[in-house]
Amino acid sequence: MARVTNSPASRKRRKKVLKYAKGYFGSKSKLYRYAKEAVQHAWQYAYDHRRKKKSDFRALWIVRVNAACRNAGISYSRFMEGLKAANIALDRKVLADLAVRDEAGFNVLVKQAQDALKTKAASAKKA
């Protein structure tokens, strides 16, 4: 009896892996053994970085809002505290967009945050 190798399926699987490894350097794109490992690592990195992208963007938004706050004469943490005290619920993504695209609108928010901080401090002194 002939040896059964399931050749069509094996060839298809190997070709698929080599297709995914197209563009990789050297033997990683030519040899199945190394291509399989490279593709698995690539997929793992892609999975991890899809999650890391969220924190990267959050950090970028914070940097942008902080820069705009410093230009307006307030620190980022005081600004965020003031927004919370003023019951302004805007996320960092929207704040960063405002800071970049609409400086006047952002300065209005800074003013509201500063006013809320003053009233918060005044009420804390009374108590």
Swiss-Prot record:
InterPro entries: Ribosomal_bL20, RIBOSOMAL_L20_CS, Ribosomal_protein_bL20_C
GO molecular function terms noted in the UniProt entry: rRNA binding; structural constituent of ribosome
UniProt keyword RNA-binding, yes or no: yes
GO BP annotation list: ribosomal large subunit assembly; translation
Keywords, ordered alphabetically: Ribonucleoprotein, Ribosomal protein, RNA-binding, rRNA-binding
Tagged with keyword RNA-binding: yes
CDD domains found in the cross-reference section: Ribosomal_L20 (cd07026)
SUPFAM superfamilies membership: Ribosomal protein L20
A GO cellular component entry from the record: ribosome
Function: Binds directly to 23S ribosomal RNA and is necessary for the in vitro assembly process of the 50S ribosomal subunit. It is not involved in the protein synthesizing functions of that subunit.
Family: Belongs to the bacterial ribosomal protein bL20 family.
Protein name (record): Large ribosomal subunit protein bL20
Source organism phylogeny: Bacteria, Pseudomonadati, Verrucomicrobiota, Opitutia, Opitutales
Gene name for this UniProt entry: rplT
